[in-house]
Amino acid sequence: NSDYYTRQRVVQSAADPLHATPGDIGLGTRVDTIVRIHDEFTFTKLKTASSNKECTSYKEDILKEITQRFPDLQDTGLLNDIQNYYQAWNNFASHSYESSQKENLLNITNTLTYRVNDTALQLQTIHKSINDDIVIAVEEINRLGQQIADINKQIQSVESKSSSVNANDLRDKRDQLESTMANLVNISTFKNDIMSDSRYGGAMTDQGKDYTLAIDGITLVEGVNFHPLKLDTQASKDGFATIYYELNDETRIEMSNKITNGKLGAMLDLRGRNVDEHGEFMDGTITDFRNNLDTFAQTMIVHTNNIYALSAQDKMHSMDLKDMDKDMTLQNYSSYVQSGSFDVVVYNASGKEVARKSINIDASTTMNDT
């Protein structure tokens, strides 16, 4: 038996006796029908509980993955790099003329920027993987919905032959598909003409002829007919999928805000549901993480540039270069001048670059060349 097998009971009654002298001869019993011991109310509560569990479990798995990727232990992680960055600035402020402090600040800044960029990249990767999971989940929901519609057709065919014939195994299989779909998304099922009969063990409610399966009032399965969910990747700047339902007149109903539970509901909670006019998600846990990281990086850049701005000057000059001839190479003038290149960058009061000049130095470079 499968995990979704429902207990069944044979309903019997006395068979017509053989009439004889001196009295009737009993011929045992006959099978009237076979019924499922199934309580639809309990089954509905089970599906809801299962949907809640899958929603919570998926969120837990993703958030654990994020925690493992971004540890903030005492000596590792982004927090440690930020603390080192501030300490390097303090050391540089106290010993600004020491070249070692400048090199230390540069190295620690490179470490911090790498960590921020790597964190942003990993969050983007997780964001994309959740979107991939959404596409797979929608495809599975559509597959399950079509299978349920096909089973409904088989149930109608079997039970139309006689009022005493019940398609119990097919109903078990449909319950299995319902439970699987409930793990993915918040669904409601409606079965008209449900029969209640307590003679066969507990509060038995089963059967039901007309069948409807819906997500927040939007019908996916109506008897033998199935209406699929559809995906659109045009609204999002990153090509992330949005979920919609298309009516017969091709009117679209946005489904992301109607899907609130199950594994797919958790995916949308994490990735985001609503896209603005620029194609950016306006909600979602991972979206908030990425936005907060971007805000942190931008704030760090602005405040660091403000430190430089405090020492901004209208002009600069060096020491008098005695005995410096215009045709003398720089490296002949001083052994401290090494081959290489650097940029001279000019910023305005808003921190925007307004001019840049690249200086290249080699063995033949003179002051006239620069």
Predicted regions and their residues:
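Structural signature of extracellular appendage/secretion-system components
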Residues: 1-370
